[in-house]
Regions:
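Short hydrophobic/aromatic-rich motifs at helix boundaries and adjacent loops
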Residues: 1, 161-162, 212-217, 362, ...
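ATP/Mg2+-dependent ligation/transfer catalytic cores
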Residues: 1-210, 227-241, 252, 388-389, ...
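Short acidic (Asp/Glu) and glycine-rich catalytic loops that position anionic groups and cofactors
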Residues: 7-11, 167-169, 270-281, 366-373, ...
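Active-site capping/gating regions of soluble enzymes
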Residues: 17-18, 26-33, 38-48, 52-120, ...
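Histidine-centered divalent-metal-coordination microenvironment in nucleic-acid enzymes
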Residues: 113, 152-166, 209-223, 257-279
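Eukaryote-specific, cytoplasm-facing alpha-helical/coiled-coil scaffolding segments in long proteins
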Residues: 324-326, 415-423, 467-476
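Intrinsically disordered, low-complexity charged/polar segments
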Residues: 408-438
Length: 500
């Protein structure tokens, strides 16, 4: 028995003694039979960014074989706005590598994410998961390397305020109980996410913490480990489903909305990326940021105005992207700098053995920390279409390897100061700005769409649909229009409270 596999929280991994990437149809059937699973759920992302579910009762083995092999029909026009009702039938086919036991189901149930196929049995070009697959595949074909990612999933928990052990307003970062009220809820979420296959790094309370009209609003975060980019999207998708369902069970309201109210921390969805080759992280060379990393960053300096179309998808997103809110407003990057768009966080590049210094009885470990270095995109938020967002970032990083002056772009956009401080206002003025509305984001995507459509990664129909939806908000002057109008701002927040 493999001890590492036996420790895995996903019941299938522990039982089958193999990683999810090796799951077969026979494995799924064996698990269902031996664990007395009575139902199967197909789950798949729709155009609103949320998971949809199709339930099956297992009548007999022949029926189980049929649904696992053939999938089922669904109405694509009810799932995606860019699919017309006249030719809307799609197939959904389960991906065995995503299988998990539903932690909420009273009847033993096995759930799997699905891929979409058209009438000819070919992958649907505009499907979220297939778009990301194409972006990842093309990145590898162009660079010879693998694109990996992980997300920092921020959310607010909202419940009646007891008045006891009040936390300090906007000072909730890494707070412990009893000042942080929802630690138990967060750790239960983490346990369930791990059971569904999520590779979690850690969880903690976040900056946002305030009371309003008798309710406490507490911001929390669950951060994941870097994995292949398609797997990263699947994990985040399921994690949001878990957190919402558990919130419902506890009687808490939960939101991933980018903005709650004026002057309070909004919720982001920061994405960390690393580039791998032969199992080795390529982000560092000789302890400093590598040329490979700087080329990828250059791509993210060229395309961020249009990338906002994927992770900043409703008007409240642009109320978060303002100065002094730990959210970026300008196109730049830097080391350990939270005022920039792309941050290079600490990467354990120091030559000292900190464990030995903290624990004198320990011998030097010579632990390989080179795998840890990432770069972080800080503009995304909880309204994101996860698959489009990660596909867009893969395209941007790939583009950095295709432009001749990538290293010059990286050098010109690097900053090592807080760009929002008055003494640095000249530097701030020299930097390109992110869009300030959905309409502006749509305009930027229209201008740069050819790069996303290259290699047929994003289909023209998908880009058209995104632009049409963003322009439909008609929010070009909304940020200025709502200045000093807290009640109207609150109405807007409520409208998009359950986005993404």
């Amino acid at each position: 028995m493999n001890y590492d596999l036996s420790m895995n929280a996903n019941q299938l991994v522990a039982f089958l003694q193999k990683p999810t990437s090796e799951f077969t149809k026979a494995d799924i059937i064996s698990f269902i039979q031996q664990k007395d699973i009575r139902m199967v759920n197909f789950m798949y992302p729709a155009g609103d960014g949320r998971l949809k579910t199709l339930n099956f009762v297992i009548n007999n083995q022949a029926y189980l074989e049929a649904i696992l092999t053939c999938g089922e029909r669904v109405d694509g026009s009810s799932l995606f706005s860019f699919i017309e009702a006249g030719s809307s039938d799609l197939y959904v086919i389960p991906r065995f590598c995503t299988a998990f036991v539903d932690p909420f189901a009273e009847i033993p149930t096995l759930s799997m994410l699905c891929s979409f196929f058209n009438k000819d049995g070919e992958p649907l070009e505009s499907a979220p998961e297939h778009t990301l697959y194409k972006a990842s595949k093309t990145f590898t074909e162009v660079t010879g390397m693998e694109f990996q990612a992980m997300g920092e999933l921020e959310y607010y928990v909202i419940a009646p305020d007891t008045g006891m052990f009040q936390a300090t307003d906007q000072r909730g970062y890494h707070e412990s109980g009893p000042y942080a009220k929802f630690n138990e809820f967060r750790t239960q979420c983490m346990s369930y996410i791990a059971q569904t296959g999520g590779q979690i790094k850690y969880g903690h309370s976040e900056v946002g913490n305030f009371t309003l009209d008798g309710y406490i609003y507490e911001q929390n975060e669950i951060e994941f480990l870097p994995v292949p980019v398609s797997q990263a999207a699947d994990q985040l998708m399921i994690a949001k489903w878990v957190i919402r369902n558990l919130g419902y069970r506890y009687g808490y309201n939960v939101t991933f909305a980018p903005k709650i109210t004026a002057g309070k921390a909004g919720s982001g969805l920061h994405v960390h990326m690393r580039i791998m080759k032969d199992g080795k992280n390529q982000m560092l060379k000789d302890g400093v940021l590598s040329e490979t990393a700087r080329k990828a960053i250059a791509g993210m300096m060229v395309l961020p105005p249009s990338i906002t179309a994927f992770p900043n998808t409703n008007p409240t997103s642009y109320f978060r992207l303002v100065p002094h809110q730990e959210a970026p407003t300008n196109v730049c990057w830097g080391d350990r700098n939270r005022s920039v768009l792309v941050r290079v966080p600490l990467g354990w590049a120091a030559k000292t053995d900190m464990c030995t210094l903290a624990n004198p009885l320990e011998a030097e470990s010579h632990f390989d920390t080179s795998q840890k270095q990432t770069v972080e995109m800080r503009s995304p938020d909880g309204s994101a279409d996860l698959y489009q967002l990660l596909a867009g970032l893969a395209v941007a990083c790939r583009h950095g390897f295709e432009i001749e002056n990538a290293l010059d772009i990286a050098e010109k956009t690097y900053v090592n100061v807080n760009i929002h401080q008055k003494e640095n206002e000249d530097k701030l003025k020299s930097l390109a700005q992110l869009p300030d509305s959905c309409e502006a984001s749509a305009d930027c995507l229209q201008q740069q769409r050819a790069i996303f459509e290259q290699y047929n990664v994003f289909s023209p129909a998908m880009i058209d649909g995104i632009i049409r939806r963003l322009r439909g908000y008609e929010d070009k002057t909304l940020r200025a229009d709502l200045e000093g109008k807290p009640m109207e701002m609150l109405d807007l927040v409520h409208k998009y409270f359950h986005c993404g």
